């Protein structure tokens, strides 16, 4: 469950290391985001020479949360950290690599490029 002011790790190679959620997209008064939701973020920590730099405002899709998500068969999937992947306006990832596992729910939400780049889909 991600809300404004939440900090997330960045699970791609765009150069950003940490982002802070500043808005949850998908409704005028939406308060929380979960796996597969798009958020607007500010880059808080970045490596030199990356695609993005500190202070940039970017869009990202959440790929892992500590809260987890309930599946149709009644099982829950939870992760060790909160992580996001930076995306462009057309929902394609800005980076060329994805680090760490991602949830299978991204496939249902049309983030096929992220699912195909991920080393593990849980």
UniProtKB/Swiss-Prot annotation:
Keywords: Ribonucleoprotein, Ribosomal protein, RNA-binding, rRNA-binding. CDD domains: Ribosomal_uL14. PROSITE patterns: RIBOSOMAL_L14. GO terms for cellular component: cytosolic large ribosomal subunit. InterPro entries: Ribosomal_uL14 (IPR000218), Ribosomal_uL14_bac-type (IPR005745), Ribosomal_uL14_CS (IPR019972), Ribosomal_uL14_sf (IPR036853). Belongs to the universal ribosomal protein uL14 family. This is Large ribosomal subunit protein uL14.
